[in-house]
């Protein structure tokens, strides 16, 4: 798969700070490997080797571990934020890397095992500006939920609802295939998130 990917790796991991200290969340180990290394492996296993990562909090350990990606069978470039830009704002910083083809976005601080080819194929079939991977959660109270229509388009988002508002258990995984045209709605140099800012704008635009 010739698609490029952006890894969002700027997270501080405040809830883990008592355990991890100053270590950035993407470098938190899981079974002996940093979380972000598992994301890089997932991309490589799916044939994606051209990767850009957005960095914010304490980037030095990440840069030291990964370098240019040669030791991991990929090519890694970096965009370091001077101030927090949010998920979409950070990815906007990578548009010179992305070019004019659909691209993949993943989190660098969450481990998953996912068929990225299937997601890319569904995106190509749908003609959507954004295609997101969803997960059926056994504990929907903890996450932002996505309510789809019958055709697979998004009807609405519900952020960490109480039980009486739980109408689905489908969770936004933070894994997306995005058309570059969708990123035109993201302002340059401003904090802007996918779930709370960009996706509602896309829904309003139809």
Question: PLM features: residue spans?
Answer:
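A structural signal for short hydrophobic beta-strand segments in well-ordered beta-sheet cores
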Residues: 27, 145-148, 199
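Conserved catalytic-core motifs of eukaryotic protein kinase domains, centered on the activation segment
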Residues: 18-21
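Acidic/His-rich active-site region of diverse nucleotide-sugar glycosyltransferases
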Residues: 86-88, 143-159
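A short, conserved acidic/glycine-rich loop-to-beta-strand motif
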Residues: 126-136
